[in-house]
């Protein structure tokens, strides 16, 4: 776990350092055209924690959890050039872990709404602030969705406000996706930043997992539009959250079933009823093709 955190921390800094350097040297028009408003910073890191790391009434402090462990090096590097905030939401996977009992799919929707609200509020208050978006696990799925909306021009802020996006263990990762979709092995700087710092970042050498995210296939569809090259989608090989076998639709069926259910260990009867309800709709969503492909012949 320690080595993984070190790699992710290094990767996260790689995504954000071009914006930090631009802010510090006052060469990025989008960042440095005017002094930041009171209480603002040239760069705002907005993080969405993973399952079990936050709750409906959780803290907005981004110093703990996986994201906290990788944001701290950036804060140490950049000092007053950055601020950060966590987006709390019901992250208990239907009650399976701490964080709430809202079914996973509903909590993802809640997280998306709260992330959009946070970005809108900060952008309205801080005219000259750039953003780095970061998400871990379930939080990465939330950030992935909003990043795609921003890149396609339908998000809460414009794409030129986003310095970088870091997705860690993303359940919405496309199968075989490179670490930096649209860019390859290193991120790209903002087109008008005037910074060449990104050219000094060594290529990211970790192997590219050939699987994809375990989340609903609809969530992995689409691209990042204008944010292509500024998104880092980091996945450790073998991590089922982001490297599930791409040729096994049944994996998505099981995830879809769990994602619609309340999984309260103290209420097995209620859990069973919730799973039964989800199973009814999941059977329709899955379709007979899944049964034909994955539950037939010698596979039983």
What are these regions (language model features)?
Residues 53-60, 100-107:
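Second-shell loop/turn segments in exported
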Residues 41-42, 127-130:
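Short coil/turn segments at beta-strand junctions that form active-site/ligand-binding loops
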Residues 31-43:
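Low-complexity, acidic Ser/Thr/Pro-rich repeat tracts that form intrinsically disordered stalk/linker regions
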Residues 104-115, 139:
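Phosphate/oxyanion-binding active-site loops and adjacent basic polyanion-contact surfaces
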Residues 1-34:
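Secretory targeting and sorting signals
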Residues 133-148:
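Gly/Ala-rich beta-loop-alpha elbow adjacent to hydrolase catalytic centers
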Residues 43-50:
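Short beta-strand element of the alpha/beta-hydrolase
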Residues 36, 47, 56-95, 110-121, ...:
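Surface cap/lid and interfacial helix-loop subdomains adjacent to catalytic sites
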């Amino acid at each position: 776990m320690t080595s993984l955190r070190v790699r992710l921390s290094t990767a996260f800094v790689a995504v954000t350092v071009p914006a930090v350097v631009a802010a510090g040297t006052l060469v990025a028009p989008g960042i440095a055209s005017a002094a930041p408003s009171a209480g603002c910073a040239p760069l705002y890191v907005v993080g969405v924690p993973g399952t079990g790391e936050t709750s409906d009434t959780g803290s907005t402090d981004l110093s703990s959890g996986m994201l906290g462990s990788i944001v701290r090096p950036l804060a140490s590097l950049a000092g007053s050039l950055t601020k950060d905030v966590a987006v709390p939401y019901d992250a208990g996977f239907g009650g399976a872990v701490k964080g709430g009992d809202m079914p996973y799919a509903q909590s993802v929707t809640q997280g998306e709404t709260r992330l959009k609200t946070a970005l809108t509020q900060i952008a309205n208050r801080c005219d000259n602030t750039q953003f780095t978006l970061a998400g871990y696990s379930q939080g990465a799925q939330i950030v992935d969705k909003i990043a795609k909306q921003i890149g396609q021009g339908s998000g809460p802020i414009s794409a030129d406000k986003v310095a970088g996006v870091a997705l860690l263990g993303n359940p919405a990762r496309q199968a075989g996706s490179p670490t930096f979709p649209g860019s390859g092995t290193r991120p790209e700087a903002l087109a008008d930043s005037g910074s060449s710092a990104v050219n000094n970042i060594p290529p990211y050498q970790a192997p590219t997992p050939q699987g994809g995210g375990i989340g609903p296939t609809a969530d992995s569809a689409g691209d990042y539009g204008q944010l292509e090259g500024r998104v880092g989608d980091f996945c450790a090989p073998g991590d089922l959250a982001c490297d599930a076998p791409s040729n096994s639709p049944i994996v998505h069926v099981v995830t879809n079933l769990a994602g619609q259910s309340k999984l309260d260990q103290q209420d097995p009867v209620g859990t069973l009823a919730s799973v039964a309800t989800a199973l009814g709709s999941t059977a329709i969503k899955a379709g007979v093709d899944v049964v034909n492909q994955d539950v037939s012949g010698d596979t039983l």
